[in-house]
Amino acid sequence: MGFGFDLTFYCMPSKIRILPEHVAQTIAAGEVVERPASVVKELMENAIDAASSEIVVELKGGGLQLIRVYDNGEGMDREDVPVALQRYATSKIKKAEDLYAIHTLGFRGEALPSIASVSKMTIKTRVANSISGTKAVCEGGEIKGISEVGCPIGTEVEVQNIFYNLPVKRKFLKSIRSELRYCLNHFLRLSLSHPSIAFKFIHDGRMLHEHLKTESPLVRIEAILGRETVTHLQVCEFDDGEIRILGFSSLPSISKGNTDDIYIYVNRRFVKDRMIYKAINETYRHVLSTGRFPIAILFMTTPPYACLLYTSDAAD
């Protein structure tokens, strides 16, 4: 029985397809892992959240060939390892309200699975109450094997050949020197805000940075920015019972040609806030020449509910 119009249009197969899970994960991983420095940042944050007192970052070829981060933190139980490699698997939050009570650097549960999706990754981890550890081997987001292994307490994550399965993205990475600089920036930012942790940074077998643990933020600042810089810093403190600020800012006697040495932290998380940058630079406007900027390290501590963390995949 006809109705005067062609029904074949409604029977045509759809051109829209739901992507396979591994393809979707690889695309999503590109938002979290932009370059080797993203891996360094995510793995260092995981190590810090694991209550580590020592963290070592080792790179080869600016992180293009190899990134290895190992710590002496809490480690993971064998049964937790495959779970940690799934997206949105995290021990940091359980419900939306927990976003207002976060005390850790990581919370989205995307670091390990995202890194695994775009590299060849090996994890070795062991908890204190176990005589042996667990080793997981992943390639392109697929777990190739999980086995028992001898290793110290803590976690070691080795990432090789980043973006080997995304050649176009790898092509747009910069030179080894540039990628190394990006990695160092994240290393120094995290090292600066966690003086009670010892850090090492090794590139192509050469120790570039070694920071001993200390309870003094000023000692860590000196280790990173230099003794001469520290002698030209003034201390500022503020505490109203809810918000606490500890700041170190340069005297007009020294300045920089860029804002690279302005470090702002909220609850030990490095942030870039235009209003704070503008306020700092405005303070120095009448004492520094045009095009010159101060050195400033600002640590702000607030209740977790006072600031909403950026929950995007590409959060920095």
Protein language model features and the residues they cover:
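N-terminal phosphate-binding caps/lids of nucleotide- and nucleic-acid-binding domains
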Residues: 12-308, 312
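Positively charged, low-complexity/disordered segments
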Residues: 314-316
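Short, positively charged and aromatic/hydrophobic N-terminal segments
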Residues: 8-9
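Low-complexity, intrinsically disordered Ser/Thr/Pro- and acidic-rich segments
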Residues: 1-5
